[in-house]
């Protein structure tokens, strides 16, 4: 259920500060968003997979925490990121 190495590298290159930046909040939020979108497709086929749904809820919660942190520390980066990812806020 995880993302491929190529997909992760592409996300890191797009949202990171450099090619090796996998730990910044922006990259972590982008990776979590990609994983969440991937799992949503899984749940359209497997409606009773409650174990994976718990993992999805943990990812959504972690993304929310990272977005709250980013909003507190750097509002311009926060607004740019949610615009690029197409999140609701």
From Swiss-Prot:
UniProt entry tagged with the keyword Oxidoreductase: no
Protein name, per record: Small ribosomal subunit protein uS15
GO biological process, one term: translation
Gene Ontology terms, MF aspect: rRNA binding; structural constituent of ribosome
Family: Belongs to the universal ribosomal protein uS15 family.
Reported function: One of the primary rRNA binding proteins, it binds directly to 16S rRNA where it helps nucleate assembly of the platform of the 30S subunit by binding and bridging several RNA helices of the 16S rRNA. Forms an intersubunit bridge (bridge B4) with the 23S rRNA of the 50S subunit in the ribosome.
Subunit structure: Part of the 30S ribosomal subunit. Forms a bridge to the 50S subunit in the 70S ribosome, contacting the 23S rRNA.
Species assigned in the record: Photorhabdus luminescens (Xenorhabdus luminescens)
Record's keyword annotation contains Cell wall biogenesis/degradation: no
């Amino acid at each position: 259920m995880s993302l491929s190495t190529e997909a992760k590298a592409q996300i890191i290159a797009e949202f990171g500060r450099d090619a090796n930046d996998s730990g910044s909040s922006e990259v972590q939020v982008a990776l979590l968003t990609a994983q969440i979108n991937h799992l949503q497709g899984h749940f359209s086929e497997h409606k009773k997979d409650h174990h994976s749904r718990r993992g999805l809820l943990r990812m959504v919660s972690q993304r929310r925490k990272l977005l709250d942190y980013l909003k507190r520390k750097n509002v311009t980066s926060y607004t740019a990121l949610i615009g690029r990812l197409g999140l609701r806020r």
